[in-house]
Each structure stands twice: as structure tokens, then as C-alpha cells.
Amino acid sequence: MLKFGLACEGVTDQAVIENILCGFYKDKNLKSEIKAFQPLFDATQQKQLEGEFGGWEILLKFLSTKRFRQEVINNQYMIIQIDTDISEHPNFNVSQHNLSVEELIEKVVERLILEIDSKKEFYSKYKERIIFAISVHSLECWLLPLYKSSKNGKISGCFETLQRESKKIKVIKDYKTYEKLSHDFLKYKKLINIASKNSSFQAFINRLPKKI
């Protein structure tokens, strides 16, 4: 049984979550105990497995499958990551109107639970194993404080801002780049400090079990 399974929108998100977990638990070798199940990842090539597809709609479909339920049972924890920038799409249907970051996170979590239980009631029995990483409005907003200081956590336009502010690393959407961009998350104190600058990042950190 592995420590963590990952169900994310894409491989860039997987790279960041892996570094967060290694930093939070102060164990760089923890990566060997983490496996990406959506999208499946080719560790040798460090890219999405050939024929695999990412994206939020594919992620939603995965959450309702027997394979997802089996992987939750077979792993100590399953982390589900999704950005909220798509929440108002008709196929997701979570309004952002007049919601705080915390309220939006809860609405998105409720929507994901509906998907998990859409074919078979499952969540209530295994909820202690399922951890939600809801990035408002994109995971780049979690990375941004590493490259640009700000009193208020930015929640929109983060990818474009990250591209401008990252001077040493060219920001392109692949695994290796995001592994480098999030490298400082391997340092526990740095991780905790950066998470405190973004409400949705802090919410994810708060959901992580203290010991594994």
C-alpha cells in the first residue's frame, strides 16, 4: 500500500503536490510512496503516459469509476486536485458569485463528492482517506508567492504573472518545469510560510494528516 495516490487535472499539478507532500512530511524520499492515477504518469520519461489525457472533465469521469474506488481502497490516502477557474462551466456548475475562498472550496468539494457517489455510494465510508486540494483559481496561485511578494494572496491571472516573475525558470506547462518551480516547497519552513499567504493553499495544508 502506497502512502498517497494522486488524482489531478494534469502532470504539472502532480509535480507540485509531490513536492508539497515531501516538504510537509520532511521526507524527500516520500516521492517513492506517491503514485499518480489520473492522469497516469510515465516516471521514466517524466511526462503524461502515452494515450492518457488530463483536464478537469477527464478527472470528473475518473472519480466515478470503479478504478478510482479501488485505488482509494488500495492506498493510504488519495488526493484530489482541481482548479476553481472552471467551476462555473455548465458541466461543473458551481457559481463563484458572492462566495469567499473558503465557501467556494466547500462548494467545489461538495460537487466532487457528488461525482464520487454518482454510480455507487462510496465517499462516506472512505472519506478519511480522501484529501481535497482545491486551488483557487489555479495551482499557479500557490507557486506565485515564491516569485513575487504580496500581502494579499492573488487568485486570478496567476499563470501569466508567474511567467513574468520567474526570471530563472521559463514557465511552460510540463512536469519538469513545475517540479523546478515548486522545489522550495521541499523546505518545510518555506512551505508553511508560503501556504500562509494563500487561503486555498493553507486549506489544503490543514487537510493533510499530521502523521502518515
Pin down the residues of each PLM region.
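C-terminal accessory helical subdomains adjacent to catalytic cores in phosphodiester-
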Residues: 14-50, 57-212
